[in-house]
């Protein structure tokens, strides 16, 4: 599924920044799509020769050593939701707990809300959510297990204190 280009598109013109920006784009895309799928679509779209293993090495490697081409980076950007045109003009902010694939967010976004925090533990729901919704890396936090941000996951905290 192709999307509008992501905000970093203009930065890819600076070849010196390109490897790190492409790496960042790959990291974002890999939270949405399986590496096997990304390798397949990059190969189909750009005539690349990526495999799941070779993309995994790129993900784990140093950003400045990223070997994906600018063309690959631009295609990956097209798979990531872009910033809505009215993003800065939102009327209120909200959090999306137990988010699923974003049904509640759909309604809140429609009436002018800006999501600042999302929590979803299911891997597949989380990937679908990220594929459907723009998440600003500076304003939005994506969390998997709600217990990671509450007191209930801390062994030194009693049940009475946690609840």
Q: Predicted regions span which residues?
A:
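Conserved active-site and SAM-binding loop architecture
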Residues: 2-163
């Amino acid at each position: 599924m192709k999307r509008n280009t992501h905000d970093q598109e203009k930065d890819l013109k600076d070849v010196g920044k390109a490897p790190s920006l492409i790496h960042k784009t790959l990291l974002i895309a890999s939270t949405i799509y399986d590496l096997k799928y990304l390798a397949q679509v990059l190969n189909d779209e750009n005539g690349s020769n990526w495999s799941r293993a070779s993309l995994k090495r790129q993900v784990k490697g140093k950003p400045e050593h990223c070997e994906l081409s600018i063309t690959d980076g631009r295609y990956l950007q097209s798979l990531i939701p872009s910033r809505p045109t009215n993003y800065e003009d939102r009327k209120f902010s909200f959090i999306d707990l137990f988010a699923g694939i974003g049904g509640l967010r759909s309604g809140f976004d429609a009436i002018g809300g800006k999501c600042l925090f999302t929590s979803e533990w299911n891997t597949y729901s989380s990937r679908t959510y990220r594929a459907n919704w723009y998440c600003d890396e500076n304003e939005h936090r994506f969390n998997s297990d709600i217990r990671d941000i509450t007191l209930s996951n801390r062994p030194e905290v009693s049940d009475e204190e946690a609840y």
